[in-house]
């Protein structure tokens, strides 16, 4: 009987006006694909995220799930492949540690990234791994959260987090582990913001927040910046972006009017 396990981390350290997001400088990642030297079948080689068809499968699966959520989303960004996130994910998978990477190993430029892990005793398809994460939807109530204190929903909420639009994944064969196949996906910017996990997106008419930037129900007007504080909208209104403090700490609010962030 095949065994599957999964794990999730997608926590952006999020604080309000009293504090800041804690981060470190981005560490340049080197693509280091890992393939076992002996005895590995073609099914594993076919999972390599260096393959364009695999990248397309992963991105399309995520976008299909994102546009199909209930209630429908008005501000869900369309995901796209990111080579830096993929390199970070592959580097971490290659370590075969079966735990989550450090925050500094989950960054793309200035963005913090979330992370989903999936472990299997056989080379499952990427679509199956992603669907396994998404299936936590059955334990989730929109605007409420998990149906029970024990329910795990973090994989699902990361997949459907409205502002996470960059994705990169990697897979490794770990012969010393009982579950020998480790799948890692990283999502940027990270979802599962503390205090907001029960509302991973705004409900409403698909693309209601981006009527002029819509691709089959998903928004394409992403923002290249992030805000440091959760109340940047009110800070901008009160002090305006002429303030050095607001300009420095509320870059999305000041530079991304009309965009999703």
Report each predicted region and the residues it spans:
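Mature extracellular or exoplasmic CAP/SCP-family domains and secreted bioactive peptides
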Residues: 2-261
């Amino acid at each position: 009987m095949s065994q599957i396990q999964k794990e999730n981390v997608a926590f952006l350290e999020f604080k309000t006006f009293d504090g800041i997001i804690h981060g470190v400088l981005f560490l340049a990642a080197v693509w280091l694909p890992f393939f076992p030297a002996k005895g590995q079948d073609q099914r594993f080689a076919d999972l390599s995220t260096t393959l364009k068809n695999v990248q397309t499968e992963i991105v399309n699966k995520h976008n299909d799930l994102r546009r199909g959520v209930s209630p429908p989303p008005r501000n869900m960004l369309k995901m796209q492949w990111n080579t830096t996130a993929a390199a970070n994910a592959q580097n971490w998978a290659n370590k075969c540690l079966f735990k989550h990477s450090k925050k500094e190993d989950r960054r793309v430029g200035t963005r913090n990234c979330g992370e989903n892990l999936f472990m299997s005793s056989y080379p499952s398809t990427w679509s199956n791994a992603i669907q396994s994460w998404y299936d936590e939807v059955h334990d989730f109530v929109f605007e409420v959260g998990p149906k029970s204190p024990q329910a795990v929903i973090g994989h699902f909420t990361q997949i459907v987090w409205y502002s996470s639009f960059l994705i990169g994944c990697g897979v490794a064969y770990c012969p010393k582990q009982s579950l020998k196949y480790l799948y890692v996906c990283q999502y940027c910017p990270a979802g599962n913001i503390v205090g907001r996990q029960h509302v991973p997106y705004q409900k409403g008419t698909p693309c209601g927040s981006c009527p002029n930037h819509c691709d089959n129900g998903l928004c394409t007007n992403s923002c290249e910046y992030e805000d440091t504080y959760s109340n940047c909208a009110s800070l901008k209104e009160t002090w305006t972006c002429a303030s050095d403090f607001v300009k420095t700490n509320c870059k999305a609010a000041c530079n991304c009017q009309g965009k999703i962030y």
